[in-house]
Amino acid sequence: MTKELRSKLFTILKIAFALTLFTIVAITLYKELSHINLKDAIKSFSKINRFWLVALFLSGGASIIVLSIYDVILAKTLKLKIGLAKTIRIGYIVNALNAVVGFGGFIGASVRFLFYKNTTDDKKALFHTISIVLISMLTGLSLLSILVVIHVFDISHIFTPYPWVKWLMYVVALFLPIFVVFTIIKPVQKTHRLLGVYCTIVSGVEWFVAALVLYMSMAIVGVQIPFATFMGIFILAALSGLISFIPGGFGTFDLVVLLGLKALNVNEEAIVLGLSLYRFAYYLFPVLIALILSTFEFRSTAKRYWEDSRILVPVKDMTSLLGSYQKDIIARIPSFAIALLLLFTSLVFFLNNLTIIYDGLYDPNHYIYYIIVSIHTCACLLLLLNVIGVYKLSKRAILFSIISVLFIFIATAYTYASFILLSWLTVIFILLLVFYRRARVIKRPFRYSKLLLSVITGAIILYINHLVIKSTFYSLEIYHIEMLTSILRYYFWITILLVAIIVGVIVWWFEYRYRSSNSRDNIATCESIIDKYNGNYLSHLMYSGDKKFFINDNKDAFVMYRYHNNTYIILGDPIGNSESFYSLLEAFYKEAEYLGYDIIFYQVTDKYMSLYHSFGNQFFKLGEEAVINLTSFTTSGKKKRGLRATLNKLDDLGYSFEVLEPPFSQQMITDLKAISDDWLADKNEMHFSVGSFDEHYISQAPIGVLKDNEQSVIAFCTLMPTYYNGVISVDLIRWKQDIELPLMDSLYLNMLLWSKDNNYEHFNMGMATLSNVGQIPYSFYGERIAGRVFEHFNGLYRFQGLRRYKEKFNPKWEPRFLVYRKHQSLWVSMLKVMRVIRKNN
């Protein structure tokens, strides 16, 4: 059998053993706990002296400091480059988490190695020393087991029915001398032969302190047994929990304590209550303290871990994937810790609804409790729903949490002014204020899927909350009082109303406070960039007056955009120095992420697809744009006789074409406005991706006009310079509707001929929407739907007609795309773009 196979087999057997043991323990515990009277347990808890309860929790929190001695010994032995205070803090965090998710101490050993490997060059010695610390968890119990064997601690009442327990104690007791002798003969470091002895002493003290916390919790609930007997039961229970490999010994430890004390005729309700207090005081409370310490301890650790490490310098040079992920994980520890604290707080205070409602049942003024319990539930729900937002360091989510904690504090102070709960809320409030200043983003981007998930989650939580309250009151036999006083009749609806009001106010305030800047209309800078680096097909639309401009720090590149509904919608590709496009978009995306906005690109070319892809985008083909090569364009030949016929017909009528240069006379503006209004009729102007009839906009470029035989303007088109590779385009094409002549054809033909005569090389006729989109069965689903629209909805919008019309000029078709974030809906993105095109606000 190979070494690898043996390792796999051992792992499988270990997991099978743990699962089997856990199943047996769970079944046995269920049978034992089924006899517990919940009502009696709650009454017993209500009688506990609050001073002693606070003292118990403080003792549990302080007891973990003993475990930090392991880390101090580790640091001194290996001469780690780390201060004493920091060693104690990290030791506290590691040991508190290890107590809950230890798996026999292996998790704690792994975390220790991760934290300390950057402080020493000798990783092998670090690994072996941590192994000594791991094994010493058992040697401490072995030391205490010797005291059981020599009858200092008495568990004879267990030895009698279970004689094998006695032999187990002998075996465990023998482990200590073997371990001590081995570590002295083969030490990790020859200068520290007594390392195993030191760790064993610390382990023994650790287990003894844990026993004192459990003994104190039992004494608080009225369990009075000789300390020597109690210690014997505790040692056996701790040994069972350690061997089980179940995190924290949950279930196994508790079952042995329950059976051991029950054999001494101790009340079951008191045992369960004492064990619960012990679990909260010795396990949960230190974890909460560790999470609080984590929010401060690892704030700058990631940066130092990455930048100051001699070991990681070559890793950085190789851009190590593993190293970068380690950096990210460490940097995320503080936000993850505060998120867990908020999750715990919300769940605990949801249970506090029971206390508030219970008080209200016996209060003559029930209506006050309608409001209090609704506010309390609303705050707990908002706190829970914003856990992920706080983890993402969203300022808005943190503000939601701050307000929620304030509401919970007020409700708790008014109804059940527990010193412990109010102190805890104060700590959470202070932490949230600290994180509010550290917030990385204003808010997260809005998604309808997130909204739906929040609504469903909120509804499920409220329903579970109702079931817990209902089942608890039935168990306490007081539900009939609730039915008579109807304290919960309007509870749900008041909660929903309060959630809606709070969410609405905060969302409105953030939208008002952090609305996109209105000062980005520096056209002069954009003009200078275009003069130096050229523009693109859409750059002339910067004069339309409905766009803002994001210009990079070097002032050599910019994008045109509109803000709409938490989204920056960018028109076309970036403009300017192509070498600056990446840094330009990086800065723009950082701003959008900070403000919680999405980014959509509309009508981009395929030239910069790799650039857009690098920012996590996906693409949808909008259609194709017709570009005519003017060097080969002609109206001669048999195939072009239709074009010649159009020109000849208007020439015979005495019509003429002329290109006018700005500035234009007021009379000309008035005449053009009349034609534009007639052409629009009852339709509205479109915006953003096309120009509109605005005196300032049309005065920025020449205008081609078609005049009748009386020299009156009957049609016009606005030129659209691109400042790009000899390309010109037209924007507005409008004519009098009462003249039944091919005026649009005439305008296009005359513009093509004029452009060719003026040495332009290409003429852009604009986009045929949805043209050549989704025409093969392997296209994306959304594109295939768009293709069907192109084929079958010609009566609704002339998709096919536009392409057929432009085809007669024999253009080259260039694709245009919509670019949007990977997790954003295509249809929502399209609707946002349509909105800014249809509305000028």
From Swiss-Prot:
Q: How does it sit in the membrane?
A: Multi-pass membrane protein
Q: Quote the EC number.
A: 2.3.2.3
Catalytic activity field: L-lysyl-tRNA(Lys) + a 1,2-diacyl-sn-glycero-3-phospho-(1'-sn-glycerol) = a 1,2-diacyl-sn-glycero-3-phospho-1'-(3'-O-L-lysyl)-sn-glycerol + tRNA(Lys)
Report one GO cellular component.
plasma membrane
Stretches in topological domain Cytoplasmic:
1-8, 74-89, 151-164, 217-229, 292-336, 389-392, 437-448, 511-841
Q: Where exactly are the transmembrane stretches of this chain? A: 9-29, 53-73, 90-110, 130-150, 165-185, 194-216, 230-250, 271-291, 337-357, 368-388, 393-413, 416-436, 449-469, 490-510
Ranges per topology, Extracellular = 30-52, 111-129, 186-193, 251-270, 358-367, 414-415, 470-489
Please, one GO biological process term?
A: response to antibiotic
Broad EC category: transferase
Query: Where in the cell does this protein reside?
Result: Cell membrane
Keyword line: Antibiotic resistance, Cell membrane, Lipid metabolism, Membrane, Transferase, Transmembrane, Transmembrane helix, Virulence
For the keyword Lipid metabolism, the answer is yes
Gene Ontology molecular function: phosphatidylglycerol lysyltransferase activity
**What InterPro entries does the entry give?**
Acyl_CoA_acyltransferase (IPR016181), L-PG_synthase/AglD (IPR022791), LPG_synthase_C (IPR024320), PG_lysyltransferase (IPR051211)
Similarity remark: Belongs to the LPG synthase family.
Q: What does this protein do?
A: Catalyzes the transfer of a lysyl group from L-lysyl-tRNA(Lys) to membrane-bound phosphatidylglycerol (PG), which produces lysylphosphatidylglycerol (LPG), a major component of the bacterial membrane with a positive net charge. LPG synthesis contributes to bacterial virulence as it is involved in the resistance mechanism against cationic antimicrobial peptides (CAMP) produces by the host's immune system (defensins, cathelicidins) and by the competing microorganisms (bacteriocins).
Its protein name is Phosphatidylglycerol lysyltransferase
Q: From what organism does this protein derive?
A: Staphylococcus xylosus
